[in-house]
């Protein structure tokens, strides 16, 4: 999609929630998946990019997203919010089910164009963060790393934290890396540019 202005980002809605591929939308609209740990800020990322307060529900309780949530944006693109990983209070059986559901979507969905992998700028990436990045690289799925909660760290320390994250992920320079804050509205244009480049 060459021009961002042809996309009315405010014309967005939750289309459906799916547990497996029999429930996926049947069309060829390109999709961008959003992956990250529970409470990394996926819902806030979606709401901020789409200029909506509560389109994706934010929750103080991690593990709230239990299905693949498909958000329709102007009938031209979809965001797919996948269950957050790394939430300790979810049973092993449930975590395994989520993992299978996410893997099935990421490896078999023709509509998928890229994955936004969200990490917390404040902390070193978790084992699950690293595994997700390695998984996407292995399957040659384009990845956009978004480091959230940049407002929680003084700007003078951003470079240090970015370097820490890139080193832990074994980050490849061809991938986009974006510092983001839904509070201070940092990184919105950069995120859209990286997403639309993949459509």
Swiss-Prot record:
Protein name (record): Probable GTP-binding protein EngB
GO terms under cellular component: cytosol
Source organism of the structure: Streptococcus uberis (strain ATCC BAA-854 / 0140J)
Biological role stated in the UniProt entry: Necessary for normal cell division and for the maintenance of normal septation.
Family: Belongs to the TRAFAC class TrmE-Era-EngA-EngB-Septin-like GTPase superfamily. EngB GTPase family.
UniProt keyword annotations, A-Z: Cell cycle, Cell division, GTP-binding, Magnesium, Metal-binding, Nucleotide-binding, Septation
Residues given in the record as GTP binding sites: 36-43, 63-67, 81-84, 148-151, 180-182
Domain EngB-type G residues, every copy: 28-199
Gene responsible for this protein: engB
Lineage: Bacteria, Bacillati, Bacillota, Bacilli, Lactobacillales
GO terms for MF: GTP binding; metal ion binding
Binding site for Mg(2+): 43, 65
NCBIfam families in the cross-refs: GTPase_YsxC, small_GTP
Co-factor requirement: Mg(2+)
Any single biological process term in GO: division septum assembly
Entry-linked PROSITE patterns: G_ENGB
PANTHER family linked: ENGB-TYPE G DOMAIN-CONTAINING PROTEIN, MSS1/TRME-RELATED GTP-BINDING PROTEIN
Database matches in Gene3D superfamilies: P-loop containing nucleotide triphosphate hydrolases (3.40.50.300)
Cited CDD domains: YihA_EngB
